[in-house]
Amino acid sequence: MLTSGGDCQALNAAMRGVVKGLCSKRDDVEIYGFKDGYKGLIYADFSMLTSKDFSGILTRGGTILGTSRQPFKLMRVPDKDGLDKVEAMKHTYHKLNLNCLVILGGNGTHKTANLLREEGLNVVTLPKTIDNDLWGTDMTFGFQSAVDIATDTIDRIHTTATSHSRVFIIEVMGHKVGHVTLHAGIAGGADIILLPEIPYDIKAITKVIDGRT
């Protein structure tokens, strides 16, 4: 099992569910946790996991396995050090005699996971991203927490905006989609919500701002 890409809330909770679920089904199950994303799989950097490792971390943010955004390209060409990363991951998989890889991540993570699947490895992925932009699921874990935090930030800024009669522009994360922006904007009572999916006219925005002065 590994976590890859950006960290977010619920990673530990999701891994806890996987580990405790497997341990409850079989007494002889062996679970390996690869450290810092795909790097752990490439360089065989792992540790054995048990249900005890996940006790008391249900509400803890981040990931106890560590994660990485290492910008390597998974091509069938060795890197400058002569390492074929695809073959290295396959070697680790077969050396440990794994039955399946459980991978938690977003779009980039899933692309790599799909490549490994095409190479013949058994892969199960869990949809993790605050952006909520993964196909095949209504809501990814990490999204609701991001909306809650963004909404709380908007609520706090309201007091300063009112006290100083100022206009605030708040930018939130979301990659190329506006799910967090839309939900947090509505919940926080934003006067204008700009989404990457919808073209907008700057003159119309100016008109709304002028109307509030």
Which residues are covered by each model-predicted region?
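A glycine- and small-aliphatic-rich helix-loop capping segment at beta-alpha/alpha-beta transitions
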Residues: R16-K25, M48-D53, L115-T125, F141-S145, ...
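N-terminal phosphate-binding or glycine-rich loops at protein starts, especially the Walker A/P-loop
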Residues: M1-D45
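Accessory alpha-helical/coil subdomains and C-terminal extensions
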Residues: T92-H94, C100-G105, K111-L115, N122, ...
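Acidic/polar active-site rim loop that often engages polyanionic ligands
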Residues: L126-M139, T162-S163, A187-G188
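Short, ordered loop/turn segments at secondary-structure junctions
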Residues: S4-G6, F34-K39, R69-Q70, G106-T109, ...
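Glycine-rich oxoanion-binding loops at beta->alpha junctions
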Residues: Y43-L101, F141-D148, D152
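Short glycine-rich or small-residue beta-strand-to-loop segments that form or flank ligand, phosphate
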Residues: M1-C8, I64-G66, N99-I103, F168-E171
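Short acidic, glycine/serine/threonine-rich loops at helix termini
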Residues: L11-A14, I42-S47, R76-V77, T112-R117, ...
